[in-house]
């Protein structure tokens, strides 16, 4: 195609990087009582709806944002964001084309933790928002300004507004919420650390004062919503046939209103349903096991939170009457709880779980690969490793891009992003007290000693099962159930295939006992989020298992 001189000149002008822009984020005395250590951000967007700060993050549609550490910042001081400040999806502010934009500044404060392991670290103490770096209570933000950015831009943004605390929903006759101070995790962090629960009560719970109920524990990314999406909100508008067809093509999971109507009318088996809340200073989910960086969350959940639920509610306090389900992060969590605490739970239904075999750490093999960003199996044609894809197979984000985003959000593995979350949960502690990097976020070079430490600690669930099946296997018969789509957006089906291969091998002579669980695969083109049953159907499956495993009178 031939370009006219005018069009060619316009394209050249648009592509000229801007090298001299400077943004100053200023903290007025009225907004800051003490010095603060944390992370400062500049957000730039083409629209102000929503606010620019809510348009930046580790996702493929992110608007440009830039981040810098601040230490002992005093009121009245300025934080400079310029062409040397790292960013995403633009690596530098200097690469931003000239034009009109909406801009906003933010300062995320960190908390100092003098941990029991002797390390002192700074990280964001979750405020029950779920480690949302751009929307955390206590953060200082500026007003949104519309400006023209060019080579001479020099803008000052006043960080004069403090984001308010999270408003926790009120209890109802159906849904209750509570938190406890975990003695175990608080001792590790030398700081008060909460565990929480959102409890959904069955129909007739208040009227049947002597009846006890089995418990289904749901686990996953931090939320204040009720288990299984139970809600009364928006239920006056029925699902259209077209919307239902689209939903069922993706997953059998029903809308929250439909589940609520079945639950409140007594059409589901009678369980107490509990969603577990366990954010850490590194991620919105602890990954439910004891961790060198996060602390003893596995013991805290099983020895503190579950006994508290048994104390507060009329549960059947027996392992056969405790079942688990969750998807994605929660899918990994429920398998990990069932496998590592087999005497506490009576079955896990894992949906599209995070990597259950680290030979597919999403896509790559952290035990044998040298780089997390690039495949070098063709020396003259190195290829970028995808991190996410469409159900049709088109790459959405690469590993390099996602890690660039996390490195923009925070240094030292504190981004609250997915890769940093896994690293905090499973990696050893580094010499500086922060999680030891599994790979270099700039180059992608893998540290295999970290990978081997993760394997040795039992976080590679398939490997842990294979090494310990003779002792743990008898306690897991009939208790492991996994479902995933064949085109999971994050390649999580690959690890599930490997897990099934091992578990099915337990039927071979000398390898038993046979695991006697199940695997289900969504085909064709089923994405992340696919499940083969509605939540109502899943509860019926769980109720049948609870009844089968109940002690005989």
Protein language model features and the residues they cover:
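Non-catalytic cap/lid and distal C-terminal segments of serine-dependent acyl enzymes
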Residues: 45-553
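N-terminal signal peptide c-region/cleavage motif recognized by signal peptidases
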Residues: 15-17
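Bacterial N-terminal signal peptides that target proteins for export
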Residues: 1-7
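Contiguous beta-strand segments within globular domains
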Residues: 21-27, 33-41, 192-198
């Amino acid at each position: 195609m031939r370009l006219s001189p005018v069009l060619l000149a316009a394209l050249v002008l648009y592509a000229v990087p801007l090298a001299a822009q400077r943004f100053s984020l200023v903290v007025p005395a009225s907004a800051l009582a003490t010095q603060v250590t944390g992370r400062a951000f500049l957000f730039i967007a083409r629209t102000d709806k929503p606010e620019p700060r809510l348009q930046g993050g580790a996702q493929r549609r992110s608007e440009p944002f830039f981040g810098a550490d601040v230490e002992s910042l005093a009121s009245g001081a300025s934080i400079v964001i310029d062409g040397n400040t790292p960013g995403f999806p633009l690596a530098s502010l200097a690469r931003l084309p000239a034009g009109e934009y909406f801009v906003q500044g933010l300062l995320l404060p960190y908390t100092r933790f003098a941990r029991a392991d002797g390390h002192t670290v700074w990280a964001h103490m979750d405020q029950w928002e779920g480690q949302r770096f751009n929307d955390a209570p206590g953060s200082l933000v500026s007003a949104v300004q519309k400006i023209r950015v060019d080579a001479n831009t020099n803008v000052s943004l006043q960080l004069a507004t403090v984001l308010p605390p999270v408003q926790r929903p009120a209890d109802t006759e159906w849904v209750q919420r509570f938190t406890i101070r975990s003695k175990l995790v608080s001792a590790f962090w030398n700081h008060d650390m909460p565990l929480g629960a959102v409890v959904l009560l069955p129909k007739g719970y208040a009227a049947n004062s002597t009846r006890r109920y089995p418990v289904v524990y749901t686990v996953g990314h931090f939320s204040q919503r009720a288990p299984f999406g139970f809600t009364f909100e928006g239920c006056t508008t029925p699902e259209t046939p077209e919307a239902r067809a689209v939903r069922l093509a993706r997953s059998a999971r029903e809308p929250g209103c439909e589940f609520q109507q079945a639950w409140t009318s007594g059409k589901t088996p009678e369980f107490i349903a509990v969603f577990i809340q366990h954010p850490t200073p590194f991620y919105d989910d602890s990954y439910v096991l004891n961790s060198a960086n996060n602390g003893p969350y596995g013991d805290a959940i099983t020895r503190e939170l579950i006994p508290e639920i048994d104390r507060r509610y009329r549960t059947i306090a027996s392992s056969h009457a405790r079942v688990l389900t969750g998807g994605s992060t929660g899918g990994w969590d429920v398998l990990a709880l069932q496998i590592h605490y087999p005497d506490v739970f009576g079955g896990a239904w894992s949906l599209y779980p995070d990597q259950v075999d680290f030979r597919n750490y999403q896509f790559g093999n952290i035990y044998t690969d040298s780089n997390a960003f690039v495949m070098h199996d063709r020396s003259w044609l190195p290829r970028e490793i995808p991190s996410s894809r469409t159900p049709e197979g088109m790459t959405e984000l690469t590993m390099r891009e996602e890690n660039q985003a996390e490195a923009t959000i925070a240094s030292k593995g504190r981004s609250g992003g997915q890769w940093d979350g896994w690293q905090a949960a499973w990696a050893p502690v580094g010499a500086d007290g922060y999680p030891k990097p599994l790979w270099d976020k700039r180059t992608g070079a893998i540290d295999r000693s970290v990978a081997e430490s993760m394997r040795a600690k039992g976080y590679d669930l398939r490997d842990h099962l294979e090494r310990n099946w003779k002792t743990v296997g008898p306690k897991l018969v009939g208790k492991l159930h996994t479902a995933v789509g064949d085109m999971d957006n994050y390649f999580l089906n690959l690890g599930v295939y490997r897990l099934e291969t091992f578990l099915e091998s337990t039927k071979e002579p000398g390898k038993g006992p046979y695991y006697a669980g199940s695997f289900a695969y969504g085909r064709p083109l089923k994405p992340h989020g696919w499940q083969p049953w509605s939540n109502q159907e899943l509860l019926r499956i769980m109720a049948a298992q609870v009844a089968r495993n109940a002690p005989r009178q």
